[in-house]
Regions:
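Iron-sulfur-associated redox domains of electron-transfer enzymes in respiratory
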Residues: 1-152
Length: 152
């Protein structure tokens, strides 16, 4: 894999070849599993009611576009916050996430990131926030390939 001018392989332009699929039942539409608004980490308040007694998904922005089954495989039954560790101002994220973890009874945390190196920063941020919170909450990281498959 070549590097772009900025040195980040995640910024490399690429075409993803797909064979055209035909849906068995084109009258059935996927149902959204989103249970809250807003979803951007910058916008969600730490005291939002959907974080209480919840499983939380913290997903990199690109994950929902890369993983076709995002709603059914990752989002279903979870509160969500999305962020981009490369493009967002992430300075407030560690403290904000720590506040979410401290102020709520969180059952589990799933971090969903892309396989590109710059996306790993989101996993690091969440782990630092969890440590800062003083809580012990089960944490899982899901790594999604740029071709749309789960890597782990």
């Amino acid at each position: 894999m070549g590097h772009s001018a900025c040195g980040c392989p995640g910024s490399q332009a690429r075409v993803i070849e797909r064979t055209e699929t035909t849906e068995q039942d084109n009258t059935t539409k996927a149902t959204s599993e989103l249970r809250q608004w807003p979803v951007q980490l910058h916008l969600v308040p730490p005291t939002a009611p959907w974080f209480q007694d919840s499983d939380i998904l913290i997903a990199a922005d690109c994950v929902a576009f890369a993983l076709g089954s995002f709603h059914s495989d990752l989002l279903k039954g979870k509160a969500v916050a999305i962020a981009c560790p490369k493009l967002d101002d992430t300075a407030p994220y560690i403290e904000k996430l720590a506040a979410i973890f401290r102020q709520n009874e969180v059952k589990s945390i799933t971090v969903a990131i892309m396989e590109v190196p710059c996306c790993r920063g989101l996993d690091v941020i969440v782990r630092q926030a969890l440590g800062l919170s003083g809580k012990e909450i089960p944490l899982e990281t899901a790594i999604i390939g740029v071709n749309g498959e789960r890597r782990n």
